[in-house]
Amino acid sequence: MLVNAWQKTFFFNFSQERVNITGAGRTDSGVHALAQVAHFDLKKKIETTKFLRGINQLIGNKPVTVLKINKTNKKFHARFDAKKRTYQYTIVNRQSPLALQKNKAWHIRKKLNTKLMEKGAKLLLGTHDFSTYRSASCGAKSPIKTIKKVSVKKNGEKIIVKFTSKSFLQQQVRSMVGCIKYLGDGTWNFDDFKKSFKAKNRLKCAPPAPSCGLYLRKIIY
């Protein structure tokens, strides 16, 4: 939807040019983005303030907004120039149903052991073959990725899981969280979790966490 609005803005209001938009990352349906970056090439000069106002008017009341527009060099690529991406997964661990956080977090009623979840998450640090957490439809050439940072933090009834890497496989974060959840709720012990990871086999993965709790949190260039 955002790409379509951008193209309409350019084509009808600004440049009469067809513009291709490239985002920094692709997300599954239902996943949120707190920080998304995109680039486009344009021959005609535009007034950025006017453009920003125009694109947000076209977006209307949809839950999307463009916060800033910057001019950059011709070689910049929103996807390939990114050095780090941080994804955040939000779990609400309580008995009562969600209200304001509905469709924005994973509601889990069974009490979770966050210390054990953190132990499992830290096992994923470093460079590994993440085939267990790779979607069957993933188009990446290699399952090898490097997790640079992980954290599992509990704040009241909220549990926030974060992963930082240069890039991720399709459904990797949701799959890792699904396995960490199995560890936290007692479905698996730590040895089960480790065997699943080391198996490098998608069939050994727990069900992926639902998309509603996942957020693209930060992109660093």
Residue locations for each model-derived region?
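Structured-RNA-binding interfaces characteristic of tRNA pseudouridine synthases
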Residues: M1-Y221
